Amino acid sequence: MAKVKTKAIFKSYNQQQALLLPPTLDELISANHLVRVVNQVVDEMDITPLIEQYQGGGTSSYHPRMLLKVLLYGYSVKVYTGRKIARALCQDINFMWLSGMSRPDFRTINGFRSSRAKEVIEDLFKELLLFLMREQYIRMENYFCDGSTFVADGNKHKMVWKKNALRYKEAAEKRCGQLFKEIDELNRQEDKQYGANDLEEKGEQSAITSEAISQQVKSLNQTIITATGKQQKRKAESLIKKLEKESDKINKYDRQIKTADNRSGFNKTDEDATAMLMKNKVEVLPAYNVLGGCEGQFITGVSVHQNTNDATCFAAHLEQVGVQQPKQVEKIIADSIFGTEQNYELLEKKNIGNLMKYPQYHSEQKKKNKENPFIRENFAYDNQSDTYTCPNNQQLILKSTSKQTHKKTGYESTIKIYQCTNCSNCPFYEQCCKSEKGNNRTISINEKLDRYKQQARQNLGTEEGEKLRKSRGTEIESCFGDVKHNMEFRRFHLRGVKKVKTEITIVAMAHNLRKVHLEKIKRLKNAA
């Protein structure tokens, strides 16, 4: 039987329909929307330090609370640039409701972020943490710490390497040395002609400095004035041009070396950015090392560094987050890269619980290491005689004590060297000694570090310590994962370490607001 075709019916559609009572923007936004969380949290924050950034006078300014809301919400929904936020304020009802229909342009938004917010960003972050504590999202007890690299806003093809600057400077100085010899030869020719020997010879004995080059240029100018022959004048003029060219190069390389400082190099676009190896182990890009800490997957501290090594940045990280946090954390849980003597000592001074692994932590737990009598950790130690005993019952006595200084941090460690009295005819020599045949077994002992390791081993071995150690991967790694994957923030949009620090703190605040939103929805579901 053929299907009967009926007339299609459509819902009413009239763009010109006038409403007697037009809906407000508030009615169009759902009760559990993220924008309402941002609005509520910022309304409860004390932004007095931010308001104090405004000197007063002149025309009226957009309210800083509104600008802060717009900026945080923009970062929460992956709108990071000033122009895109300004466009959203005209097109997106969430932005329009949050701003109260205010429409600051992109210059106002960028200026607020890069100047006024930059000066008080730590205070604003602290206010957000206080809100999280009041609402019992965090307690500031445990601090799960780790680092991650973020690409800088710089051209990857415009890297300046310090070693190249040093090499090029050395070559330029050699060329200057050759020019100095030519100047000495020109002076000797002048002396033969005029019989005056009042010009000091530079040549190889002269240090290539800006003052030395200026002095040579001055003498050449004098030669041009006094010389009667055209050939001498042309030669002097040519040498002046060459010297000035090499002088400019040396000054340029000096500036590059000074800018690089203790780094391997810098980026021309963002001079504070450092070349760092990305996670794929292939690309080397201008980047910053971001160290962060969290509790309950809420970011409770964040800092920016120009060094790729997390361990050497840890002391600076604690100093920076100390300003951001309303109270000091009780325990720090971190991966083995952080387990250095300097960092352990820092935790002890600050009276913070030590749950940081060290590089050999997992290998020590293996059966083959526990049962290996030839590793120095398994040698018996006699405290009274200050000696170690090897598997062949031979004593290792203290041979020397030395100081070792860390190249980058300057931290000094005390190392004790113990040596066996007699390893000749030892049946375990091949298994015990890794050095050349005939040398007695020596071991290096850092008593202070060993004490800190034992402390970490005991803390991590408890039921609570084991639970916290296992939670580290799901805590801070989840925060970085949310920022990089869900928020798609892998590259900074500002330049300079201070502005970059401001931006990553805004990102951390946006992450926390997103997390509050999810927790509120979860609580509503559990209450239903």
Where are the regions a protein language model picked out?
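A generic alpha-helix surface/boundary motif
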Residues: 19, 67-68, 126
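Conserved catalytic-core motifs characterized by acidic clusters
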Residues: 99
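Hydrophobic alpha-helical membrane-insertion signals
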Residues: 1-36
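Basic, short loop/linker segments at the boundary and entry of helix-turn-helix/winged-helix-like folds
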Residues: 30-72
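Anion-binding and metal-coordination hotspots
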Residues: 2, 6, 12, 71, ...
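A short secondary-structure junction motif
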Residues: 44-49, 92, 96, 486
